[in-house]
Amino acid sequence: MEINKVYSGFRLDRIERIDEINGTAYEMKHEKSGARLIYIDSPDSNKVFNIAFRTTPHNSTGVAHIMEHSVLCGSRKFPLKEPFVELVKGSLNTFLNAMTYPDKTMYPVASKNDKDFHNLMDVYLDAVLYPRVRDDAEIVMQEGWHYELDNAEDELTYKGVVFNEMKGVYSSPDSVLERQMMRELFPDTTYGVDSGGDPDHITDLTYEEFQEFYRVHYHPSNSYIFLYGDMNIEEQLAFLNDEYLSHFDAIEVNTEVGLQAPFTEGKVVSYPYSVGSEEPTDNRTLHSFAYVLPDVTPEHSLAFEVLTHALLTSPAAPLKQALVKAGIGSDVSGYYLDSIRQPMWTVQATGSNLDKQADLQRIVESTLQELCDNGLDKELLEASLNSIEFALRESDFGGRPIGLAYVIRMMDNWLYDNDPLELLHYEEALVNIRKGLSGTYFEDLIRQSILNNNHKVLVSIYPERGLQERKDAEVKEHLTAVKAKMSPEEIEAIVEQTKRLKLRQEAPDSDEALASIPLLELSDLNPNIEEVERRESKIGNTTVHFVPTFTKGINYVGLYFNLSCLTEDELFYADILSDIIGRIDTSERGYEALAKDINMNLGGLSSDITAISKDGKRDEFTPLMIVRAKALHSKLPDLCRLINEVVQKADYSNDRRLTELVQESKAIWDNEAFRRGNSIVSQRVMAQVSAVGKFRDNGNFGYYQKISELASNPAALPLLPEKLADVARKIFRANNVDIMFVGEEGELEAFENLMKPLIETWDTTELSNDTLKITRLSGNDGIVTAGKVQYVAQGGNFVDHGYKHVGPMSVLETILRYEYLWIRIRVQGGAYGAFANFYDDGNMIFCSYRDPNLVETLNVYKELPQYLREFTLTDREMRKYIIGTMSSLDLPMTPALRGPRAMGMYFSGTKLEDKVEFRKQVIACKPEDIVALADVVEPVLKDNHICTMGNEQKIKDAGKVFDNIISLG
C-alpha cells in the first residue's frame, strides 16, 4: 500500500513501523463519510475490530450507557430483539463486548476464525449505524428505564437494565467516592457527570433526548475504526466501504471534550454514603485527594506511572508509609489516569475517619515537599521503572486479545485529535526517564504538576446508617405522588405499556429473523485441544515440572505448596501468609529493601491460595498455596534468590508491620466486598454442599469475617507472629512442594542448578497430609448490606443424586446464561445478569448479580426443570449453542497461562483424551440431551441451598428462606 493512494474510499495518509508491538500501522481517512481508520498489520491470528464514537453527555441520565445497550437490540440487517446475545450464543469470538467510558463508547470484537470475524464486524457495524432503537422507544424503556405497573391498584415502580446495573455500582463505596471526586474536579465538562448514569437521574431521560444524542454522536464522521492482526486489509476496507461507509456523507461534528478551567484554589468536601443498620461506622470513611494535571506529554505520562508505583504501590512507598504510620487510613493507594483529556493523579485512603481529612492533605503535601527538597530515593525509582518496563515488554493481558489493549491505549490520544500511534512507542521515553534518574526529573515533575497546582480536590465519604432507607422512602413517596397526579386513562396506559413490554420480552424472534445472524458450521469446530507439554524432573525429592514455551525471554516460576498438612483453623493463617508474602521483613533485611530488590529484578512476585478438584471426584481436591514469580531470563538468579528469601527467610516478629497489613486487608475488603457479591454468595452456597466449597469460602467471605474480627481485637494481634511462623514451618518444606518452571528449551538446567543449593537448605520434616478436615456450613445465609440490589445464588451437587459431569452440561450453561436466565432475570427481571455453572466434581450453581429481585429470582430457578422438559430447538439453534460453548472452552493461552494450565491438569488428574472426549460430547449434543438434564437439576434445587447478599429489607422480607442473617461489615 502507498501513501496518498485511495483504497475502497480510504485515503492512506501514513505508514509507520512500531517495533515495540512488532507491527506496522496504516492511518487512513474515509473520504466520503469522514470516518477515521487505523490498521495494525501484525502476524497475530487473534484479529481485532473496534468502532468507537466520541460520546460527551451533559448530564447524568446515563444516555451514553443506555445507548451502548440499546443499539445492540436489533438493526436493519439483523432485526432480532438482541443480535448481540445471538452472537454470544453462537460465535467463536475471543472477545465480544461494548464499553461506555466517560467520553467515548467502544464496540470491540475479536476472533481467530476469518468467517466469524467477518460476521462479528457486520453485526456490530449494522448495530451502531442502523439500530432499530432510533424508531423504537420500547428498547430504551427496557434497557434504560420505565414505569412498571402490572395492575392499576399496584404501587408504581421503576425498572430497567441500566437503572439496576447502576444501582449496583452506586452500592459500592469506592464508586460513590469516584463519582463525587469527578464531579468536584470537573464541574464544567463532561467528566463532571456520570456517563454510566446516576440512578437518581436516569429516570429524567426522555426518548427525544436519547434520539438527539444518537443523531449527534453516532455518525461515521465521529467514529474511530480500528483493525488489527493477520488479515487481507484491502478486502476489509472494501467491505467497510461498500456495505456501510459509502452510504454516509461527512458532516461537521461538535463532540469535542471541553477543558476544565484550572482552579485558583483547592476544594475540601465530604458526603455521606449508606451502610447497613448493623454495620460498624468507625474506620469506614474513604478519602480521595486528587489533582487535575496541566498538559502532560506521553513521556511524562509514563513517568507518572513510575512515580505512582514508587510513591504509593511498592511496600517501600514513602507517601503510603507516611500516611499509614500517621494513622490516616488502614489502606493507602493511588493511581494516575490518562484516559481522559485532562489527566489526573490521586491518593486514596480507606479504613479512616472523617476527622483525618485535614491531616491527609497536610501529610501528602508536606511529604511530597520533603521528598523534593531532599531528593527521591533513586533506587526506589529505578526499581519502579524496571517494574513498569517489564509490564510493557511482557504485554500479557490475561488472555485478552493484545490488539484490544493497543486500541484502548491509542484512544487516549486519538480521541483528542492527537497522534494515536505515539502511545504505542515507549523505547525513547524509557531512555529519557532512565536518564532522569540521575537528576531532578521526578522532583521537577512533582513540583510542577502537584505542589504548584491548585486544581485539586479532597473528597471524603463517610458512612451513615439509614441513608439508603431514607432515599428509598423518598423514591417511593415521589412515585406515589406521580401516580396520584395521573388520570385513570394515564394509569391504564402504563398498565398496557407494562403488558406490551412483557409480551415483547417473552415473544421469541421469528425463524426468519434468527436466520439473519450468520452462523458457522459444526465442521468449523475442532474437537482436539492443544497439548501443553509438561516434563518432570527432580531436585532431591522435590518434583520440578518444566513447561517448554516460547516466552520472549521471560521465565515464570511457581511453587505449589500442599496445604493438606494444616487444620481448617490454620487455613486462616495460610491466607494471611499468602496476603503478606514479600511484604514483610526477612532475616536478611527490612521489607522496604526487599521490595526495592523485587521491583528492581522481577516482573512480579505474588501468592494465592486455590483448590484443584480431582477430575470427576465428589470431594477430593488438592489445597494449594502458590507462590509465583516472573523475570527476564537474565534475571533468573535473582528470581531464585528472592523467591527463596520470601518463603524461607520471612521474619514474622514485626508486630507493627503485621498489624498494618491486617488493617489494610480489612479496609480493602470493607471497600470491595459488595463488588465481589457473586463470588461470595456462590462460594457460600458451595460451602454448604462440599468440602472444596467450604475451603474456598474460608478464603473468601469466611476470611473477611475472620480478618475483621482479628483487626478489631488488639489482644489477638500479638499472638499472630507465632501463629504465622508455625503455619509457615508446616507449609514451606522441600517435600511439600511441586515447582513449575516455564521457559524455553535449554533454560531448565540453569534453573535447576540455581534452585538445587537453595532447596537443599529447606526443611524436610515429614508431616501427615491427612490433617485437613473441612466442616461444611449449615443453613442458608442472608448477608445484609446497604446495597440497592441483590446477588442471589442457589446450588448443590448432582453427584449426590447419581449423575456425572457431561458435555451437554456446558451447552446448558450457554443456554441458561443467554436464553432462559437472560430473558427471565435480566430482560424481564431487570437484573444486570445471571449465570449457571456445572463443575466436574458435581457442584452446580445458579447466580444472579445486580438483581432488584430476590424471591422472584429463586422462583425462576425453581421453574427451570419445567423449562427444560419443554425444551425444543431447531438444528440451527442447537448448532448455535454448541458453537458458543466451544468458544468458551477455547480461551487463548499466553505464555504466562500455559504453566498454570499444565499444573491444573496435573493436580486434577485430567488426561488430554478426557478433555477431547468432553469436547466431542459438546459437539454431538442434541436437544434431547438438554431435556434429560431436567432430572439432574430438579433434585439439586430441591436440596434448597441458597445464599443472598443485598438489601436488608429485601432479605428480611424473604422470611423463612434464610436460616442465618449476617451483616456484611
Please identify what each model-predicted range represents:
Residues 41-43, 50-52, 163, 167-171, ...:
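His/Glu-based metal-binding/catalytic segments typifying zinc-dependent metallopeptidases
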Residues 1-48:
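Non-catalytic terminal extensions that flank enzyme cores
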Residues 212-214, 224, 233-251, 374, ...:
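Extended, regular secondary-structure scaffolds
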Residues 151-222, 226-244, 248-275, 281-283, ...:
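Hydrophobic, small-residue-rich alpha-helical packing segments that form membrane-like cores
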Residues 159, 211-243, 721-755, 942-943:
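Non-catalytic, conformational "gating/processing" segments within enzyme and secreted inhibitor domains
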Residues 95, 211-215, 274-277, 319, ...:
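Generic recognition of flexible, low-complexity loop/linker segments
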Residues 46-56, 82-130, 137-148, 175-200, ...:
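M16 family metallopeptidases and their MPP-like homologs
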Residues 63, 67-71, 577:
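Active-site His/Glu-centered metal-binding helix of metallohydrolases
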